[in-house]
């Protein structure tokens, strides 16, 4: 499994299949997904004094993230998104 370093977070992005009106979009018309599920988290950000600040999300959290955040990574036949904690916008209940 992927183990992110520092304040990085591994997400499994969730694609939206339909518009609010129920119209299915062509694959080239879709925007990059902005919601995902946290798969793994790093230990946190290290401050200048050496103190580690833990990441605010945990595995299994559903999150919103910036539209162009992170890097796509393929691992074991799956596509994941690796983002920094600062790229997360909110946790969805």
Curated annotation (Swiss-Prot):
GO cellular component, one term: cytoplasm
Compartments, as annotated in UniProt: Cytoplasm
UniProt superkingdom: Bacteria
Region forming the signal peptide: none
Keyword tags: Chaperone, Cytoplasm
Short name of one Pfam family: Cpn10
GO biological process: chaperone cofactor-dependent protein refolding
GO molecular function term, any single one: unfolded protein binding
Quaternary structure and partners: Heptamer of 7 subunits arranged in a ring. Interacts with the chaperonin GroEL.
PANTHER family per the UniProt record, alphabetical: 10 KDA HEAT SHOCK PROTEIN, CO-CHAPERONIN GROES
Entry's family note: Belongs to the GroES chaperonin family.
NCBIfam families named among the record's database cross-references: PRK00364.2-2, PRK00364.2-4, PRK00364.2-5
Primary role: Together with the chaperonin GroEL, plays an essential role in assisting protein folding. The GroEL-GroES system forms a nano-cage that allows encapsulation of the non-native substrate proteins and provides a physical environment optimized to promote and accelerate protein folding. GroES binds to the apical surface of the GroEL ring, thereby capping the opening of the GroEL channel.
Identification of the protein by name: Co-chaperonin GroES
Native source organism of the sequence: Limosilactobacillus fermentum (strain NBRC 3956 / LMG 18251) (Lactobacillus fermentum)
Lineage of producing organism: Bacteria, Bacillati, Bacillota, Bacilli, Lactobacillales
Encoding gene, per UniProt annotation: groES
């Amino acid at each position: 499994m992927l183990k992110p370093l520092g304040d990085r977070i591994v997400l499994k992005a969730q694609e939206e299949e339909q518009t609010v009106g129920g119209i299915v979009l062509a694959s080239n018309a879709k925007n990059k997904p902005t919601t995902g599920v946290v798969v793994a988290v790093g230990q946190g950000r290290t401050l200048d004094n050496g103190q580690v600040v833990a990441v605010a999300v945990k595995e299994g959290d559903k999150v919103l993230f910036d539209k162009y955040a992170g890097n796509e990574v393929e691992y074991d036949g799956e596509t994941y998104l690796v983002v920094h904690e600062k790229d997360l916008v909110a946790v969805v209940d």
